[in-house]
A protein has these predicted regions:
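Beta-strand elements of repeat-based all-beta scaffolds
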Residues: 1-3, 7-24, 28-69, 74-92, ...
Length: 161
């Protein structure tokens, strides 16, 4: 991709169509590697002088990413029997917290919880998001009131807000 005078981005693809090299602005290069199932297994981004990211990805037998190891540490992922993401554990370099997710019978996310906040989601009979409510756990140090966002849809089912 060029702007008419210089190359802004350059891509190299594998025979399977996956990107293997991406160069941006001539000085940032991302290199991708894939496993036999074409899941990304490594991604390294660097300049001539510095490594910006060096991530390695690991998967379970269902193809779910269960771990990402990078410069900032290891992020872990857990899933339920329906392969829905239920927990993310972040390394200390990214705050060292755990995020837990819950779902209803239809597979809609209905809860997200961290040490700092709880977010709940409510859906209509068509499984469209109707309401998002975020409450902060530590009210001693936070003056924030619970946040609520309501969503509406037109007759075609397009979200208006």
């Amino acid at each position: 991709m060029t702007d008419g005078e210089k190359t802004l981005a350059e891509y190299v693809y594998s025979a399977s169509g996956n990107p293997v090299v991406k160069k941006i602005g001539g000085n940032i290069t991302s290199t991708y590697a894939y496993d036999e199932l074409l899941n990304i297994k490594a991604l390294k981004t660097e300049t001539e002088k510095q490594t910006l990211a060096d991530n390695h990805y690991f998967y379970d037998g269902n193809g779910n990413q269960i771990r990402r190891e990078g410069l900032e540490g290891t992020t872990g992922y857990a899933y339920d029997g329906r392969n829905r993401l239920t927990e993310i554990s972040y390394p200390s370099a990214l705050g060292g917290y755990t995020e837990k997710l819950g779902y209803d019978a239809a597979g809609n996310r209905i809860r997200r919880e961290t040490e700092q906040e709880i977010t709940t989601y409510r859906y209509d009979n068509c499984n469209r998001l109707q309401e998002l409510r975020r409450e902060y756990k530590n009210t001693e140090t936070s003056t924030a009131q619970p946040e609520m966002i309501r969503y509406t849809y037109d007759r075609q089912g397009n979200m208006l807000r």
